[in-house]
Each structure stands twice: as structure tokens, then as C-alpha cells.
């Protein structure tokens, strides 16, 4: 710890630190070596000044290096490229599970989706809460998850299963009761290291910085979005987008109408607990969900299909997602994944 003291001193003086220095600090955290008081001081110092691109990237580097390894997928999967559909959470709205449901649709439409998720942060039902309702084994072995990705086009990676070291920060984060750098790290530390990302953030001020971070982390293509209060592509208002493509970042707004969708009220997307949200997801994936639910999922799946190269525009992606939902293929995929996650046919638990 003593050799890191000069880094702490610079933080306390309001100075920025490098990507490598931040990586060193966060490596201490995930190895359980950092004093909780020092950890709190570090996180608050960064928060008060505002975390830099290098600092967020360095923290992600440390957590990815410490994570349980995800086995290399097949050559076909690597050639096509992997996409994640993920949000920071913490937007304060308790909506249905849009990004999780969208993952099934994007995969059923042809994308290779490795979704990294956790239990709920702000809503009554997070990604893993929902999946457990469908009998999807969240603690499946990494080899089983890899086989699901190769064979079915979809796997879910439960964050605590891969990032055990993050538990060392939990007491400090709970005691601070405020957002810190950890609140934006979750979407950045997918152990499958996706090539493409649709990433929703809880604050419009984060859209550009997080896109810069994805570029620094060598993500090939991405859309970072904030949809009128939600960490999703919105159907109730405009979505602010920063798109990363071929090393360039462009910023624009996307409306529901531009995607060929009707505008809904945000109240139409209200979620409930895991059991109720599971029934909502089941209805959507079977092709008879409520219009606002179906279109919200199609918008997000459609943008994921676009960013992963399956379609030439978000509009085309959304149309393909709607066709996929109407066919019921996404629900069949859910059933296949539940079966595969619990069986030894694709790997060992």
C-alpha cells in the first residue's frame, strides 16, 4: 500500500491520475488489500473532481484482469463478433426488463449476445432476478456459457460469478450511500469482452464520456444511449446517442418515429417484481405483448442488431426485431437456454 501513497496524495489534492495508476489502485481493491477508509477517500476524491476517461478505463482494466476467465468461443463466433446489451441501472425508474428481453430477440434474429448482468440496483427486478424466474442457471460454468453462446447465440454472465473481488468494495459503497466510479463499471467489465455494445447510462452527461471509455477499451462499435430519463433506447421520448464506429464518435438524437414506432408514455413501461416481470417478458417473446412493451424491446434489440453489423441501420434492426417477436422464435430460444444452462449436454456445471 505504501508505494501507492503518492497516488492517494495527488487524488486528495484534486489532481488526476493515469490509467495505469488507477489500475494499480483498483487491483488492490479486488485483491482485498486496500484499507476501507483509504478506499472511501479515493472514491470520494474522484467523485468530487469528476472521474476521467483514463481513470474509468484503468478501473475497468483492473477488474477485467482479475475476473474469472471466459473461455474462447468458436472461430465462427469470434468472426461474427459478440455484442452486449446492457445498462448502468440506477435511472430511478422501475421499468420492465427491456435490455434483458431485448437480448433474446437480438440473438433470435442472428446476433451473438453475451449479456453481462447483476441483481437489481434500482428496480424491483434486475437481469438476473428475471432469468432465475425462467430457470436459467446463473452460476453455470464458464464453459457452459461459452457453449450456449456458440450453439444458441446467447449467454448470460452473472457478474458476481466472474468478479468475486468486487465484494471487497461492497461495505464501503453501502456506507457512502452515493454513486461512485463503481456505478458505471458494471457494463464495462463483461468477461466475454464484447466487440460491440449497446450501453445505456442513467445520466445524459455520461453518454459521451462512456463512449470515449469504450473507445479506449478497444470496443469496435458501440451506441451509448440515454433515453429521456432511462438507461435504454426510449419509445416515450428522444434518445441521446453517441455512436462509436471505425474509431470515430458521432452524437445524435433518435426518436421512436425514426425507428418506425409509435410514441408511448413512460408509465406504459412500468415494471413490477420478478414474477410479474417474467410474465411480461414471456408475453413479449411469444409475440403477444402490449404494444409499448413490444416496441420498447424492438427498439433496443434493433439498435443492438445494427451496432453488431446484422443490419445497416437502427430502423432496419427494429423492423427485424419486430418480425422476430411476431414469429415467437425468441421465446423458443429462452426455453432452449434454460434447458442448456442446466444440462450437461453443452458443458459441465
UniProtKB/Swiss-Prot annotation:
InterPro entries: Anthranilate_Pribosyl_Tfrase, Glycosyl_Trfase_fam3, Glycosyl_Trfase_fam3_N_dom, Glycosyl_Trfase_fam3_N_dom_sf, Nuc_phospho_transferase. GO terms for biological process: L-tryptophan biosynthetic process. Its cofactor is Mg(2+). Keywords: Amino-acid biosynthesis, Aromatic amino acid biosynthesis, Glycosyltransferase, Magnesium, Metal-binding, Transferase, Tryptophan biosynthesis. Pathway: Amino-acid biosynthesis; L-tryptophan biosynthesis; L-tryptophan from chorismate: step 2/5. It catalyses: N-(5-phospho-beta-D-ribosyl)anthranilate + diphosphate = 5-phospho-alpha-D-ribose 1-diphosphate + anthranilate. Anthranilate 2 binds at residue 173. GO terms for cellular component: cytosol. One of its GO terms (molecular function) is anthranilate phosphoribosyltransferase activity. Mg(2+) 2 binds at residues 231-232. 5-phospho-alpha-D-ribose 1-diphosphate binds at residues 87, 90-91, 95, 97-100, 115-123, 127. Binds 2 magnesium ions per monomer. Catalyzes the transfer of the phosphoribosyl group of 5-phosphorylribose-1-pyrophosphate (PRPP) to anthranilate to yield N-(5'-phosphoribosyl)-anthranilate (PRA). This is Anthranilate phosphoribosyltransferase.
Amino acid at each position: 500500500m505504501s508505494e501507492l501513497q503518492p497516488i492517494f496524495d495527488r487524488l486528495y489534492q484534486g489532481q488526476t491520475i493515469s490509467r495505469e495508476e488507477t489500475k494499480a489502485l483498483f487491483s488492490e481493491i479486488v485483491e482485498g488489500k486496500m484499507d476501507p477508509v483509504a478506499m472511501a477517500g479515493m472514491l470520494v476524491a474522484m467523485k468530487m473532481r469528476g472521474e476521467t476517461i483514463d481513470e474509468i478505463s484503468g478501473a475497468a482494466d483492473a477488474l477485467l484482469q482479475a475476473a474469472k476467465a471466459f473461455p474462447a468461443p468458436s472461430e465462427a463466433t469470434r468472426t461474427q463478433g459478440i455484442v452486449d446489451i446492457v445498462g448502468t441501472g440506477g435511472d430511478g425508474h422501475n421499468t420492465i426488463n427491456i435490455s434483458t428481453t431485448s437480448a433474446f430477440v437480438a440473438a433470435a434474429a442472428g446476433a451473438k449476445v453475451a449479456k453481462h448482468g447483476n441483481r437489481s440496483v434500482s428496480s424491483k427486478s434486475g437481469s438476473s432476478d428475471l432469468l432465475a424466474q425462467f430457470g436459467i442457471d446463473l452460476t453455470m460454468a464458464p464453459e457452459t456459457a461459452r457453449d450456449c453462446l456458440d450453439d444458441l447465440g446467447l449467454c448470460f454472465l452473472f457478474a458476481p460469478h466472474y468478479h468475486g473481488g468486487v465484494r471487497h468494495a461492497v461495505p464501503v459503497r453501502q456506507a457512502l450511500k452515493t454513486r461512485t466510479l463503481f456505478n458505471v463499471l458494471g457494463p464495462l467489465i463483461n468477461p466475454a469482452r464484447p466487440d460491440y455494445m449497446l450501453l445505456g447510462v442513467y445520466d445524459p452527461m455520461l453518454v459521451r464520456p462512456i463512449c470515449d471509455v469504450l473507445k479506449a477499451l478497444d470496443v469496435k462499435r458501440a451506441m451509448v444511449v440515454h433515453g429521456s430519463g432511462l438507461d435504454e433506447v426510449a419509445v416515450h421520448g428522444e434518445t441521446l446517442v453517441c455512436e462509436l464506429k471505425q474509431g470515430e464518435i458521432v452524437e445524435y438524437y433518435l426518436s421512436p418515429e425514426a425507428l418506425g414506432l409509435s410514441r408511448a408514455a413512460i408509465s406504459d413501461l412500468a415494471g413490477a417484481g420478478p414474477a410479474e416481470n417474467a410474465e411480461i417478458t414471456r408475453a413479449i417473446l411469444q409475440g403477444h405483448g402490449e404494444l409499448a412493451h413490444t416496441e420498447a424491446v424492438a427498439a433496443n434489440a434493433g439498435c443492438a442488431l445494427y451496432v453488431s453489423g446484422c443490419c445497416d441501420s437502427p430502423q432496419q434492426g427494429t423492423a427485424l426485431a419486430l418480425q422476430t417477436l411476431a414469429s415467437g422464435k425468441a421465446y423458443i430460444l429462452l426455453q432452449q437456454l434454460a434447458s442448456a444452462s442446466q444440462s450437461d449436454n453443452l458443458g459441465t456445471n
